[in-house]
Amino acid sequence: MSESQPGASSTTSNKCDSGFIPGDDTFTQWRNIFSILMGKMTDEGKEQFRVARDLRNEAADCKRCEDQRDYLLQYSPVIRYLSDNIRQLGGDLHSHNIYCRRCTNRKAGGFDPEYGILLCANEMKDQGHLEDTMAHEMIHAYDHLRFKVDWSNNLRHAACTEIRASSLSGECRWAREFFRRGQWKFTQQHQECVRRRAILSVRARPGCKDEAHAEKVVNEVWDSCFRDTRPFDEIYR
């Protein structure tokens, strides 16, 4: 009996500290949801809840992501257009190297020149979000083949491809900013979104010193990279 007491104490302590109650049954899940709605769960508890939910739904999330990925590869005009242009440059992106996985670092996706594209299945809100994410990463793939991007050592290269990916993928269109991110400005909204997301991305790179450094690099390449809409004739979405 004495051996079980520390575990029980730990569970009680965890609940008191964060407000999160471990458990996969429906009753426990609803208790956690109500705790969040009532403002009784800490940020740490909310993250514990999200991790538990993502683990519980991993198979279903990945299956839905794969089904939507395959549909978009076949029927989405922007995804098909980018696929064709990547193929013309000697690349090949299809279901065999566009992976749906559960991610732990709260990002939507990523591109790696060796392995392909990662789609974070547990972060996808809907098929539109998945389409924007695929388009974003496919523009990185296009840039890698077309412009020989130095991902590791050149922050200007990284800033330029982030500007282009955010501008051309559709993730910065007005409706997405207004309804998803609470950005309610009507003038210069697209440019501000692109700039903001490019700075955040550059800031996260190892060679970047701080936010001021990231902003400086983005500003240095802004004019030429924002105007460059290749492979599109203009901003498509």
From Swiss-Prot:
Topology class, membrane: Peripheral membrane protein
Active site residues of this protein: E137
UniProt keyword terms in alphabetical order: Hydrolase, Membrane, Metal-binding, Metalloprotease, Mitochondrion, Mitochondrion inner membrane, Protease
Highest taxon of source: Eukaryota
InterPro entries in the cross-refs: Peptidase_M76_ATP23
GO-annotated molecular function: metal ion binding; metalloendopeptidase activity
Residue numbers binding a divalent metal cation: H136, H140
Annotated localization: Mitochondrion inner membrane
Biological processes annotated in GO: mitochondrial protein processing; mitochondrial proton-transporting ATP synthase complex assembly
This protein's GO CC annotations: mitochondrial inner membrane
Function: Has a dual role in the assembly of mitochondrial ATPase. Acts as a protease that removes N-terminal residues of mitochondrial ATPase CF(0) subunit 6 at the intermembrane space side. Also involved in the correct assembly of the membrane-embedded ATPase CF(0) particle, probably mediating association of subunit 6 with the subunit 9 ring.
Record-given protein name: Mitochondrial inner membrane protease atp23
Organism of derivation: Aspergillus clavatus (strain ATCC 1007 / CBS 513.65 / DSM 816 / NCTC 3887 / NRRL 1 / QM 1276 / 107)
Highest classification ranks of the organism: Eukaryota, Fungi, Dikarya, Ascomycota, Pezizomycotina
Name of the gene this protein is made from: atp23
